[in-house]
A protein has these predicted regions:
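Conserved, well-structured ligand/cofactor-binding cores
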Residues: 1-184
Length: 185
């Protein structure tokens, strides 16, 4: 079975995108241009991107830069990204040129597509989803949020578990007396 495509158009022209993909032309172009490692971003990083896009949509609505319907659709779509519903559509290699623009656009296009489908209106990836944002801010912020999340949710609990195991082992060893490398009775 051959893969089917749709034609997407952006500021750089038309591009063929897999028909079921939630991303658009910019992401598909980045995948073609930067096939470096086949490594993808972590769940915590994608979640952080969704949280940033959601927060920005709320702020843009509060500042009357984004109408309520668009904002709510973007917020709902970003929540789906946060929940991990579209991780498979984050296809840009972690190694790419620039300041993560391709990754930022990957998120913008996914959220735009989901929001546009739910609202039946055209929510633009740059003009609406990425409003008041720059890749130079979004990507480092997502990196920091993801790092803190990993530290709090994974590293600290594992270190605490290790400490507890070592304390138990130390207490056990302390109770055992040794004489000539044998346990004492």
């Amino acid at each position: 079975m051959t893969e089917q495509f749709r034609t997407e158009k952006d500021s750089m022209g038309e591009f063929q995108v897999p028909i079921d993909a939630k991303y658009g032309a910019s992401t598909a172009r980045a995948v073609e241009n930067f096939p470096i490692s086949n490594l993808r971003f972590s769940r915590s990083f994608i979640k952080a991107l969704g949280e940033i896009k959601k927060a920005c949509a709320k702020v843009n609505q509060n500042n009357k830069l984004l109408n309520k319907n668009f904002a709510e659709s973007i917020i709902d779509a970003a929540q789906q990204v946060i929940d991990g519903d579209y991780d498979k559509d984050f296809v840009v290699d972690i190694f790419q040129t620039g300041s993560g623009t391709s990754t930022n656009m990957n998120a913008n296009e996914i959220i735009s597509k989901i929001a546009s489908e739910s609202l039946s209106e055209n929510i633009h990836p740059n003009d609406h989803v990425n409003m008041s944002q720059s890749s130079n801010d979004v990507i480092p912020t997502a990196t920091n949020v993801a790092a803190v999340t990993e530290i709090v949710e994974k590293l600290i609990p594992n270190v605490e578990s290790l400490i507890q195991s070592l304390e138990e082992k130390a207490n056990y060893m302390h109770e055992i007396g040794r004489a000539s490398c044998r346990e004492r009775v």
